[in-house]
């Protein structure tokens, strides 16, 4: 399983339509589920370096990147994926 965090930044278009953002977030969770991605949490982070963070788990990187391409095509957000490792996974790496 691949764990990670998707960092989300609103575009100008996304900022103009911010009131629709919670509905878009719910729709994005449904889109993720269709691709086999479990959304563990979705946090808005106003005032932070990013506008939101989505904690996910998936079978591999391909569905994650497909999800990001699909969601970003709306023009409301830009996304970056950061792989996350458990303590046990980190122990194996070091």
Which residues are covered by each model-predicted region?
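Short S/T/G/P-rich N-terminal loop/turn motif that feeds into the first structured element of a domain
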Residues: 1-34, 38-40, 44-50, 89-94
């Amino acid at each position: 399983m691949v764990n990670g965090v998707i960092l989300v930044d609103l575009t100008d278009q996304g900022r103009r339509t911010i009131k629709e953002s919670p509905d878009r977030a719910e729709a994005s969770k449904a889109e993720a589920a269709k691709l086999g991605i479990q959304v563990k949490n979705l946090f808005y982070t106003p005032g932070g370096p990013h506008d939101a963070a989505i904690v996910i788990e998936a079978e591999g990187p391909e569905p994650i990147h497909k999800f990001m391409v699909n969601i970003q095509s709306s023009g409301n957000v830009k996304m970056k994926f950061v792989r996350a490792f458990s303590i046990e996974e980190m122990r194996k790496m070091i």
